[in-house]
Regions:
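Bacterial N-terminal signal peptides
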Residues: 7-17
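A detector of low-complexity, intrinsically disordered, Ser/Thr/Gly/Pro/Ala-rich segments
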Residues: 3, 15-16, 45
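Hydrophobic small-molecule pocket/channel-lining residues, especially in calycin-type beta-barrels
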Residues: 21-153
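Positively charged n-region of N-terminal signal peptides that target proteins for export
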Residues: 1-7
Length: 153
């Protein structure tokens, strides 16, 4: 390799490393109801926005609940498994994020220190879709499970 090619090789290497390290979850995700398995009692539509912030990731949920009423909730945290306060939802007062790998992370919702709903998210290799597998209990204490299919906008 000649002296002119070395800087190019270093630049390409740094670009590839940065691209690989990028968080595939960042951006706006919209629920595709027709590809999802949603039981009665869960929200009807939802858009989730993941934004990079100085101290981690800010996650905002906007949608329509089972009664047709709009909802908004969110939190800011990191993928460290620690609990972070959440506002705007009856099923949780805290959430934690834990990254399994570049394409898989888990969210645990807690109310009063007890787990309510756990969601395992798997993002497709192309980063354009992801599936969330929900399990746990509703705000009323009833068991619930669902499979949500999201598309990146």
């Amino acid at each position: 390799m000649n002296a002119r090619m070395a800087p190019l090789a270093v630049a390409l290497s740094l670009f590839a490393t940065t691209a690989y390290a990028a968080d595939l979850n960042l951006g706006t995700w919209k629920l595709n109801e027709s590809k999802s398995v949603i039981p009665p009692g869960m929200f009807k539509t939802v858009t989730v926005v993941f934004e990079q912030v100085a101290d981690g990731v800010k996650v905002t949920f906007d949608g329509v609940d089972k009664d047709g009423k709009p909802f908004h909730n969110g939190f800011t945290g990191t993928y460290d498994g620690k609990e972070y306060p959440v506002v705007g939802t009856p099923v949780a007062d805290a959430r934690s994020l834990k990254r399994v790998d570049a394409h898989h992370f888990t969210v645990v919702n807690k109310k009063g220190g007890k787990p309510t709903i756990t969601i395992d998210y798997v993002t497709a290799k192309d980063g354009k879709t992801r599936t969330g597998t929900y399990s746990g209990t509703t705000a009323e204490g009833k068991p619930v499970s669902a499979t949500m299919f999201y598309e990146k906008q």
